Amino acid sequence: MNAIHGSFTPPHLLNNRHSPTRNIYPSSAMTGRKRKADDDGSSDDRMSASPSISSAELPRQQPRHMKRMRTNLSGRPLPLPRLLETLSADEMRNLLQSICQRHPDIGNEVVSTAPRPSIQSTLEVLSKYESAFQSAFPFGGRASSDYAYNRVRQQLIELLESLKDFTPHYLPPNEQQSATSLAFLDGATEIIHRLPNWDTYQHNRHKEEAYEEMAKAWAIVFREAAKKAGGIQLQYGGWDQKIAKHNEHSGGKMQEAVNELRGGLGWMGADAPAPAASGPEDAMSIRQQLLSGNYGMGSSASIGAW
């Protein structure tokens, strides 16, 4: 039997034979369809199906504008501007006064650079002293009794001392405007009018001395105002009526100021026309009484509401 023997080539000597090319990647069409199918699902489904960690475990990035706490934080005193913000007006005043007393040069600088107090602010301070004085009166009993005087004596002295300190500030030459000086004196004199008349005569010396000092202050301002523009401010300011009212209310203790004003307006006396007499009951005007020196004599002057 004939046998056919074929020749075989060893495998390693064979030419490289590649198997048919197979596309291991899905076709573009299938890829598009797969992506579209994935897109149709909700994001929640994809997230739930994903094996990734939950959002709570993900580190969150802090906003960039937030400041990080200092790692070297330690206790320290407040900066001066922050400390001053926490002080009340009384605490600030006491602190500044204490510093100025220990360092006179600082006190002089404060006096020279501080704004000038206004009439309103000054009268408000005096009003606080007056309110403290009124609040110190005991309940019940007579307000003019010795017991009441002993209860309010300290507050009374503080009120009168504040008047003595503030009044020179509004007098010339420190205050050049006569209108400003007179306006302050008008308000300060009203405070003295409201002080009680005590049963014991010796207790009234505080009020008597206050009237004397206030009368001198009025006289100084009248004297200086008469030198400016011929005293025209005194003529048209109505101060003749106001000082006459104060003198009447004080029981004649402002007479020195009345006399000074009379002298300042004396240059007008010769040219002043006589008032028209509409009847025997008509009294002379206050200005005419001041010029003639007859104020308070005879019938009382009609000054109207003031």
Curated annotation (Swiss-Prot):
Is Transport there in the keyword field? yes
Q: Which domain of life is it from?
A: Eukaryota
As one GO molecular function, the record gives: proteasome binding
| Listed Basic and acidic residues bias regions | 36-47
**Gene3D superfamilies assigned to the protein according to its UniProt record, in alphabetical order:** Tethering factor for nuclear proteasome Cut8/Sts1
Q: Where is this region: Disordered?
A: 1-64
Q: Which residues form the signal peptide?
A: none
Q: List UniProt keywords, sorted A-Z.
A: Cytoplasm, Nucleus, Protein transport, Transport
Places the protein is found: Cytoplasm; Nucleus
A GO BP term here is:
proteasome localization
Principal localization? Answer: cytoplasm
**Compositional bias annotation for Polar residues:** 16-30
Q: Does the keyword Mitochondrion apply?
A: no
For this record, an example GO cellular component is:
nucleus
- Family recorded in the similarity comment: Belongs to the cut8/STS1 family.
PANTHER family documented for this protein: FI02826P
> What is the role of the protein in this entry?
Involved in ubiquitin-mediated protein degradation. Regulatory factor in the ubiquitin/proteasome pathway that controls the turnover of proteasome substrates. Targets proteasomes to the nucleus and facilitates the degradation of nuclear proteins.
Subunit notes for this chain? Binds the proteasome.
Question: What protein is this chain from?
Answer: Tethering factor for nuclear proteasome STS1
Q: Which organism is it from?
A: Phaeosphaeria nodorum (strain SN15 / ATCC MYA-4574 / FGSC 10173)
Q: What is the lineage of its organism?
A: Eukaryota, Fungi, Dikarya, Ascomycota, Pezizomycotina
